[in-house]
Amino acid sequence: MTKRRVVVGMSGGVDSSVTAWLLKEQGYDVVGLFMKNWEDDDDGEYCSTRQDWIDVVSVADLIGIDVEAVNFAAEYKDRVFAEFLREYSAGRTPNPDVLCNAEIKFKAFLDHAMSLGAQTIATGHYARVRERDGRFELLKAFDHTKDQSYFLHRLNQAQLSKTMFPLGEIPKTRVREIAAQIGLPNAKKKDSTGICFIGERPFRDFLNRYLPTKPGPMKTPDGKTVGEHIGLAFYTFGQRKGIGLGGSKDGSGEPWFVAAKDIASNTLYVVQGHDHPWLRSRELVAGNVSWVAGEPPADGARCGAKTRYRQADAPCAFGRAAQAGDERFSLVFDEPQWAVTPGQSAVLYDGDVCLGGGIIESAATGRAGTAPAGRAPALVEAR
């Protein structure tokens, strides 16, 4: 009887290595595939591609599977990095990991795996896939502290039908134990952090390689100039570090936070205090939508939503756009949400089931969910 072939995306990390071992133990014909999505453009101080490949080969030798490398750098720059730069240039803060999953790991990678004769692909993501009544659902991992469904919310039925997440029902601590027990050479390797193509390098330094600085005024909500910024692209909503302001003598003395961007006047608005009303939003509008089931929730449906990774699901009401053909949606939260950021993803849940989501375009702020009087009219909002 021919074994079912599964191509596993192997990064050199512990999670994908244990994934490959588990599937091999379950009797699958496992092939490892290492993706190179970024061409190293420095001396290797920050990029770990070479060492990651060495780790993949070592793991494959230990567990007895074939492995190959594939270069998706061109696809990544066209489909992910170009959009990343466009969003930052427009003053928004994108999440390239969400787009990378949809366009590279579960599209280019999936297509390549099928060409290798695979029936299914698998990755080391912490999430689950469940088939119910002929449809596929994306669920949170049992270990909610490691759940990565937020980054996977743009996957569709075709992609989910060919995907396995073996770690979705295993706690991270157990994954580490398995790695040690079977003697994986990378058992003690640290989890990767940060955006994949940036590595551990300072983010502002990286971004400045591709986007020019464009200094402008830094103002408070009442219009007082308190400093100068280096370019709106280099700041994100809710940012505290790197603003260059201490507690002003005539202010509250509390820390400063980025609260808004006025693209037309190249002005960065900052406020003092974590609980300032400009940092709180009761409503948002999101576009560029993607629904796991292929269609949105019912208008007025109650759901939970995340506007950033690892945030607790916030209870809210879902609203469809009133105009026909407009796929955007709105969310009205039961409680104000902190630093809702245009460019980030608003991801919806019904309990453990991920429904999908969209890219945040705008968020209403203020004491009652509306913009405070005197706020600049051309803030980063709708595309």
From Swiss-Prot:
Record has tRNA processing as a keyword: yes
Site positions (Interaction with tRNA): H125, Q344
Recorded superkingdom: Bacteria
UniProt-annotated stretches for the region Interaction with target base in tRNA: 95-97
Its EC number(s): 2.8.1.13
Reaction(s) catalysed (UniProt annotation): S-sulfanyl-L-cysteinyl-[protein] + uridine(34) in tRNA + AH2 + ATP = 2-thiouridine(34) in tRNA + L-cysteinyl-[protein] + A + AMP + diphosphate + H(+)
GO molecular function, one term: tRNA-uridine 2-sulfurtransferase activity
Keyword Iron-sulfur tagged: no
Annotated signal peptide: none
Binding positions for ATP per the UniProt entry: G9, M10, S11, G12, G13, V14, D15, S16, M35, G124
One of the GO BP terms on file: tRNA wobble position uridine thiolation
Chain spans, region Interaction with tRNA: 146-148, 308-309
SUPFAM superfamilies reported in the protein's UniProt record: Adenine nucleotide alpha hydrolases-like
Family per record: Belongs to the MnmA/TRMU family.
Function comment: Catalyzes the 2-thiolation of uridine at the wobble position (U34) of tRNA, leading to the formation of s(2)U34.
HAMAP family referenced in this protein's UniProt entry, alphabetically: tRNA_thiouridyl_MnmA (MF_00144)
Protein name from the UniProt record: tRNA-specific 2-thiouridylase MnmA
Protein species of origin: Burkholderia pseudomallei (strain K96243)
Gene: mnmA
